[in-house]
């Protein structure tokens, strides 16, 4: 009976956490989403802890990345199981360690979680930085401001800390331990006060002595159906759609116009007439146009962001972080049979963190920016390197049309918001079917393309926004990278040594100390 109850609790946690990443803006659920499965750990063995957290992981990931079935059913199942294994390993590690003092649990468990999130992100080939726990708070601006110091990892730590503290409070109430209750409550309160005080301080505007350079940017959302992409019969329709939207945006006198990923319907170098139309439009509106296009060089093909002006191509960036099994086949030289299972063309890897330069009207000072293509904005290291290279603002061009009317575009937006906060830079998004918007350095979505009903995906349009480029010092996180993860790794290593002896004892987690 207890095991059956534990399974229901594990499923409940998976559902709560998945809803926190849904399109329904339920991020608050992440503050206590782990509580049911944590409570189910009472009197469980290592094997059962592994099993319970595996269930939570499967439910969470199935409910979070269900939209991948529009691309691959088998791949979705494999990925769900792989990602759920991180949950299972998490349960395995923390189960014996919960026998330690409650104060250690409050520090240890969040540290383990952050370390596993980081490993999931950087793991070779299978690195997947989607749905980090901290992303769920993208609408709660005071909570996420700490990301400019710790990265998103600090937000994830805070959420896990809150979950563990709530469990401590529940056990203290059940066992009538006033001291335990006070300790957990006070620590949670102090942690929240510290983070929220910093958050409110950062989001309140303050006078600055830095030189501001207003730059007007227009983002285009073509809303081209995925089945139209790369259909030669649709090329003129696609190009005409973007040309017409750009012409409409010209009334706002933008300094830069941004098209989505792969908006250019042909390989750039193979169809000069299409490139000429873009150059003519750039000349007409007197502003450069950043287009997403497939480019080729020396027999290789790249997924690129290309800056075009009346004179021609000014510069380009080739995507660095490609999508495995979507843009290339990992290990195909070692396992050649994969090419027959996944028959896709290879997109070559870029190797340069390119920075584009534009000159806003009425301003002889250059403004620099960098582009993140597709899911590159979910990897903090890429944005950080662009910021270090001198980018004054960031751009994300993407095509999420693959995933239909699902939560995928909203989850993708979550990552963009945290990238803006981490680097304290404006971020402009141009997405084929949405969500196209502008995000300011504190993570606020200041404007978005939407229809009259407020729908943001699968609508056609453009949006122009003036951003103020501020020449300020790089954020602490930008300068010192993932230092917070290193601290969590050290805490994990140190505290793992202590409970090894506890493996011989079946003591309950969070058990009251013996008097």
What are these regions, as identified by a protein language model?
Residues 2-205, 405, 419, 431-433, ...:
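Membrane-embedded alpha-helical bundles of multi-pass enzymes
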Residues 21-36, 221-222, 253-266, 397-400:
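Short, conserved active-site loops that position catalytic residues or coordinate cofactors/metal ions
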Residues 208, 212, 502-507, 511-512:
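Short polybasic linear motifs
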Residues 341-362, 366-368, 372-373, 468-503:
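Cysteine/selenocysteine-centered motifs that mediate thiol-based redox chemistry or coordinate metal-sulfur cofactors
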Residues 319, 323-335, 452-470:
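A short, polar/charged loop-to-alpha-helix boundary motif
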Residues 199-328, 345, 355-365, 371-377, ...:
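Soluble catalytic regions of membrane-associated enzymes that act on cell-envelope
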Residues 83, 110, 256, 263-264, ...:
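CN hydrolase (nitrilase-like) catalytic-core segments centered on the catalytic cysteine
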């Amino acid at each position: 009976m207890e095991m059956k109850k534990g399974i229901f609790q594990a499923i409940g946690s998976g559902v709560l956490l998945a809803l926190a990443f849904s399109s329904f803006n339920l991020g608050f659920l992440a503050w206590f989403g782990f509580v049911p499965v944590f409570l189910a750990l009472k009197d469980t063995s290592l094997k059962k802890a592994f099993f319970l957290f595996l269930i939570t992981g499967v439910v969470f990931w199935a409910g979070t990345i269900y939209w991948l079935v529009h691309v691959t059913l088998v791949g979705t199942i494999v990925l769900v199981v792989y990602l759920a294994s991180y949950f299972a390993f998490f349960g395995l590690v923390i189960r014996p360690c919960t026998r330690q003092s409650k104060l250690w649990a409050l520090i240890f468990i969040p540290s383990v979680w952050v370390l596993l999130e980081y490993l999931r992100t950087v793991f070779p080939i299978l690195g997947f930085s989607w749905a980090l726990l901290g992303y769920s708070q993208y609408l709660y601006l005071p909570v996420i401001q700490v990301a400019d110091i710790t990265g998103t990892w600090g937000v994830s730590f805070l959420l896990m800390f809150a979950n563990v503290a709530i469990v401590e409070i529940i056990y203290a109430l059940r066992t009538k331990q006033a001291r335990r209750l006070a300790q957990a409550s006070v620590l949670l309160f102090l942690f929240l006060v510290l983070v929220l005080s910093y958050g409110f301080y950062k989001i309140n505007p303050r006078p600055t002595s830095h030189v501001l350079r207003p730059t007007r940017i227009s983002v285009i959302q073509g809303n081209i159906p995925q089945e139209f992409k790369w259909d030669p019969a649709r090329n003129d329709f696609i190009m005409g759609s973007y040309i017409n939207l750009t012409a409409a945006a010209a009334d706002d006198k933008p300094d830069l116009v941004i098209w989505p990923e792969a908006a250019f319907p042909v390989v750039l170098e193979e169809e000069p007439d299409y490139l000429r139309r873009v150059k003519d439009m750039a000349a007409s509106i007197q502003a450069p146009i950043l287009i997403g296009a497939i480019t080729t060089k020396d027999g290789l093909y790249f997924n690129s962001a290309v800056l075009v002006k009346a004179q021609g191509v000014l510069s380009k960036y080739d995507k660095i972080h490609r999508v495995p099994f979507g843009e290339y086949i990992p290990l195909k030289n070692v396992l050649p049979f994969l090419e027959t299972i996944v028959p896709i063309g290879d997109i070559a890897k870029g190797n340069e963190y390119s920075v584009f330069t534009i000159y806003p009207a009425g301003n002889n000072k250059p403004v620099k920016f960098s582009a993140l293509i597709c899911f590159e904005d979910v990897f903090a290291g890429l944005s950080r390197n662009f910021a270090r290279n001198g980018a004054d603002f960031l751009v994300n061009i993407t095509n999420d049309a693959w995933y239909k009317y699902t939560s995928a575009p909203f989850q993708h937006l979550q990552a963009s918001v945290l990238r803006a906060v981490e680097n304290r830079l404006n971020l402009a998004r141009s997405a084929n079917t949405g969500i196209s918007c502008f995000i300011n350095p504190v993570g606020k979505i200041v404007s978005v393309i939407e229809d009259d009903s407020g729908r943001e995906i699968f609508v056609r349009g453009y949006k122009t926004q003036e951003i103020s480029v501020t020449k300020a010092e790089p954020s602490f996180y930008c300068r010192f990278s993932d230092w917070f993860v290193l601290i969590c790794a050290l805490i994990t290593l140190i505290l793992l040594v202590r409970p090894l002896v506890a493996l011989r004892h079946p003591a309950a987690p969070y058990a009251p100390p013996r008097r």
